[in-house]
C-alpha cells in the first residue's frame, strides 16, 4: 500500500510552489520520502518481502537523483528542503 490521497494532498500543499504545482522537485522528493517512510515501517513487520525492498531501492535512487538535480540548480531550495524533511546533506 502507498500513501492515500489525503496524505498526498497534505504533502503537496505543504511543499508546492504554486497553486497547481505537483511536479516541482520539492513536491516529488517529499512524496517519495513519504513512501520511503511507509515502506521502512512495512519492513519492520515483513522482513522477507524482497520484491517491495527492490521498489524501496528504486525510490531511494530516484530521490537521490532529484536531490542532486536540485542541489546543482538551486542550492537554497535544496537546503530548505532537506532541513524540512530531516534528511542529511550527502548528495
UniProtKB/Swiss-Prot annotation:
The keyword rRNA-binding applies. It holds the Pfam family Ribosomal_S15. Keywords: Ribonucleoprotein, Ribosomal protein, RNA-binding, rRNA-binding. GO terms for cellular component: cytosolic small ribosomal subunit. InterPro entries: Ribosomal_uS15, Ribosomal_uS15_bac-type, uS15_NS1_RNA-bd_sf. One of its GO terms (biological process) is translation. NCBIfam families: S15_bact (TIGR00952). PANTHER family: RIBOSOMAL PROTEIN S15, BACTERIAL AND ORGANELLAR (PTHR23321), SMALL RIBOSOMAL SUBUNIT PROTEIN US15M (PTHR23321:SF26). One of the primary rRNA binding proteins, it binds directly to 16S rRNA where it helps nucleate assembly of the platform of the 30S subunit by binding and bridging several RNA helices of the 16S rRNA. Forms an intersubunit bridge (bridge B4) with the 23S rRNA of the 50S subunit in the ribosome. Part of the 30S ribosomal subunit. Forms a bridge to the 50S subunit in the 70S ribosome, contacting the 23S rRNA. Belongs to the universal ribosomal protein uS15 family. This is Small ribosomal subunit protein uS15. The lineage of its organism: Bacteria, Pseudomonadati, Pseudomonadota, Gammaproteobacteria, Legionellales.
Amino acid at each position: 500500500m502507498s500513501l492515500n490521497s489525503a496524505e498526498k494532498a497534505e504533502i503537496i500543499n505543504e511543499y508546492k510552489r504554486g497553486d497547481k504545482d505537483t511536479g516541482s522537485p520539492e513536491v516529488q522528493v517529499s512524496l517519495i520520502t513519504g513512501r520511503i517512510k511507509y515502506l521502512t515501517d512495512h519492513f519492520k513487520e515483513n522482513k522477507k518481502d524482497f520484491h517491495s525492498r527492490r521498489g524501496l531501492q528504486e525510490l531511494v535512487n530516484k530521490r537521490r537523483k532529484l536531490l542532486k538535480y536540485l542541489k546543482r540548480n538551486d542550492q537554497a531550495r535544496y537546503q530548505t528542503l532537506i532541513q524540512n524533511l530531516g534528511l542529511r546533506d550527502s548528495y
